[in-house]
Amino acid sequence: MSKKVFIKTYGCQMNEYDSDKMSDVLGAAQGYEPTDNVEEADLILFNTCSVREKAQEKVFSDLGRVKHLKKKGALIGVGGCVASQEGAAIIERAPYVDVVFGPQTLHRLPQLLAERERLNRSQVDISFPEIEKFDHLPPARVEGASAFVSIMEGCSKYCSYCVVPYTRGEEVSRPFEDVLVEVAGLADQGVKEITLLGQNVNAWRSRMIGAASALSSEMADFATLLEYVSDIPGIERIRYVTSHPNEFTPSLIAAYDKLPKLVSHLHLPVQHGSDRILMAMKRGYTAMEYKSTVRKLRAIRPDMALSSDFIVGFPGETEDDFSKMMKLIDDVGFDNSFSFIFSPRPGTPAANLHDDTPHEVKLRRLQHLQTVINDSIKRISESRLGTVQRILVEGASKRDSTELMGRTECNRVVNFCGQPRLIGQMVDVAITETRSFTLRGEVVTQNEVLTG
């Protein structure tokens, strides 16, 4: 009987990608098969996030819930950014944990588990071996028409509030050809949509070698990579996340004019709308510069859907600062957002800033911001009524398993009736109804996809 591994993922899409790679490497090296039932798992892994305090504490709460499974012989591991930040302190707090590993050492999981068994003691490896992990991972295995590809690791921006540079290390780009080989392999498996991942994905840079360039010293930037990915047969859509406003170069903006496969959806975190707060955050741009980038993008793609991150209640935030953030939100018109009250992270400069704003004030501001964003989402959804949207069908609807769901180019979920054979296909859907954050529609494509 094969061994089972249960993986719970917290946080960002980088972690989702890493969790898939954990499953791949354990399957290839030790025959583990994934399971959604933690009770039957031989190995339980938590791939953690340390961006906010609540996410970090939830890990220890979840660890406590599976502690009893040790009696059945299950092994327990903690990976991700909390593991990188806390290291051996996790073992001190939860001594029943068997392995602790960082984002850059997930490829060493089989060796860590073997050492745990051989030495009969917990193992910790949270080193930063740069990009080594990609050299030791098996070829990607996918089910479905969409896939993530990590193209870089770490962050070198050192925003004053952010723990990522300390948990994932400095920015390191994957080699140009490695990325193209992985994308081509996924396309051969039927993947139609690729999402390129990185903490600051548009900061990617790599030397072009081999057939890709006659000049071995030529450097490729992110826009160049997008062009080459776009040329890979079978790839019909390209997304990427997360981008940094400071890395939005003229060549990247121009890519939206040259590459029709590059979708009209962008997650471009602004974090705040007050220049004073942006400076305290060490973001490196002003609200006007951010809006200038948006204007240039929408001059090329008027229907560009934008999502962003917002931090409410950063130390020293005044009502005037908050009003400036709300003005930016009104000026830009966001299709979605991820907004949170500031959470001080140990070891970051912002954790030491004086903060005298009452929590109830921060909560009121957050609720107001989210109400405004939700109203914007509703207006944008209503503007889609009566339009025909090109949908990549992903699978059964989460609301109703008898229906299908997919995403528009602008990343809006659409539910509709259709045959299972449409899964993995691109179809045209007429939008007939809007809901809070999703759309409903009817398939209007009339071709071999529907009749074959």
UniProtKB/Swiss-Prot annotation:
Its job: Catalyzes the methylthiolation of N6-(dimethylallyl)adenosine (i(6)A), leading to the formation of 2-methylthio-N6-(dimethylallyl)adenosine (ms(2)i(6)A) at position 37 in tRNAs that read codons beginning with uridine.
Assembly notes: Monomer.
Cofactor(s) needed by this chain: [4Fe-4S] cluster
Protein name: tRNA-2-methylthio-N(6)-dimethylallyladenosine synthase
HAMAP family: tRNA_metthiotr_MiaB
Family matches, as Pfam families: Radical_SAM, TRAM, UPF0004
Gene Ontology molecular function terms on file: 4 iron, 4 sulfur cluster binding; metal ion binding; N6-isopentenyladenosine methylthiotransferase activity
Organism of provenance: Albidiferax ferrireducens (strain ATCC BAA-621 / DSM 15236 / T118) (Rhodoferax ferrireducens)
Cell location: Cytoplasm
Catalytic activities: N(6)-dimethylallyladenosine(37) in tRNA + (sulfur carrier)-SH + AH2 + 2 S-adenosyl-L-methionine = 2-methylsulfanyl-N(6)-dimethylallyladenosine(37) in tRNA + (sulfur carrier)-H + 5'-deoxyadenosine + L-methionine + A + S-adenosyl-L-homocysteine + 2 H(+)
